[in-house]
């Protein structure tokens, strides 16, 4: 799994002009399978140092068990050893208690809050996360977690300092354009453009850029695309499709995109 994320998936994204980054870690749900958890922890340090890894995560609590706590702490130490930021998963159940516990444990391990992105926040947790100096991230999902309307209300109330709007292309129902659509709604509701750009772009770059693996020039000065290239003998071409070959100068930029 980790080899695929850092290998073929990185290659596949690049073949379509997408710069691929990832976090690596043992998710709290899997931490309760001790045999699996030990196997993952044995190999994780090797993958944490790979190109394109911008944080250790998502880690944290789900059911808030002793095993989750053990592997959360172990991965915080790995983040310290590798000088990587941390991406924290806050639990879906008993979220406030799990969030407070996550922050307390980070501080027990001497992790600088500026290196920690706390994800899946809501109206209950935002005050504490921001007051204690952490990055407060919000996952925009259809029907669950945080929606665009609620997110815009939070931006209006709290501003954009250390706030990150994110989303996912999940295995289930998701909205890959949720961040862009939230940004558009925020602008329509009168949130200052500078604040929207921070919450939907700049803060994520600042937080994950601390890894040394992500910088704006990666996409402002992108590599060329050559879909004739192979990865371990594998091509992204299917069904007789003609390969795309583009030099950087003909690539689209953010100014060419019109998201409605």
Go through each PLM region and give its residues.
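Active-site neighborhood of phospho(di)ester-bond hydrolases with catalytic His/Asp-centered motifs
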Residues: 23-25, 56-57, 116-121, 137-139, ...
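Histidine/acidic-residue-rich catalytic or RNA/ligand-binding cores of hydrolases
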Residues: 66, 96-103, 126-132, 145-156, ...
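Conserved, mostly hydrophobic/aromatic
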Residues: 22, 58, 79, 136, ...
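Short acidic/histidine-rich active-site segments
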Residues: 158-176, 196
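Mid-domain alpha/beta scaffold segments of enzyme catalytic cores
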Residues: 1-83, 88, 93, 100-101, ...
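Active-site glycine- and acidic-residue-rich loops that bind
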Residues: 30-38, 139-148
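Mid-to-C-terminal alpha-helical segments outside catalytic/metal-binding sites
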Residues: 180-260
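Glycine-enriched alpha-helix->loop->beta-strand junction motifs that scaffold or abut catalytic
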Residues: 52-53, 74-75, 80-85, 106-113, ...
């Amino acid at each position: 799994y980790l080899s695929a994320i850092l290998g073929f998936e990185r290659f596949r994204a690049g073949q379509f002009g997408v710069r691929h980054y990832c976090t690596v870690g043992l998710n709290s749900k899997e931490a309760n399978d001790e045999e699996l958890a030990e196997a993952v922890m044995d190999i994780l340090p090797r993958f944490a140092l790979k190109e394109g890894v911008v944080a250790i995560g998502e880690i944290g609590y789900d059911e808030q068990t002793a095993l989750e706590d053990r592997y959360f702490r172990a991965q915080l130490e790995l983040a310290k050893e590798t000088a990587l930021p941390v991406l924290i998963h806050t639990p879906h159940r008993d979220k406030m208690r799990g969030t407070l516990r996550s922050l307390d444990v980070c501080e027990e391990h001497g992790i600088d809050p500026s290196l920690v992105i706390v994800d899946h926040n809501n109206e209950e947790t935002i005050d504490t996360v921001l007051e204690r100096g952490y990055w407060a991230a919000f996952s925009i999902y259809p029907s669950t977690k945080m929606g665009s309307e609620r997110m815009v209300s939070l931006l209006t109330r709290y501003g954009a300092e250390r706030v990150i709007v994110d989303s996912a292309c999940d295995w289930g129902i998701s909205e890959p354009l949720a961040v862009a659509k939230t940004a558009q709604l925020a602008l329509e509701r009168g949130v200052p453009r500078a604040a929207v750009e921070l919450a939907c772009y700049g803060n994520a770059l600042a937080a994950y850029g601390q890894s040394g693996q992500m910088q704006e020039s990666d996409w402002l000065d992108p590599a060329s695309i050559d879909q004739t290239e192979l990865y371990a003998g594998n091509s992204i071409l299917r069904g007789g499709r003609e390969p795309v070959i583009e030099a950087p100068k003909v690539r689209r930029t953010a100014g060419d995109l019109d998201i409605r």
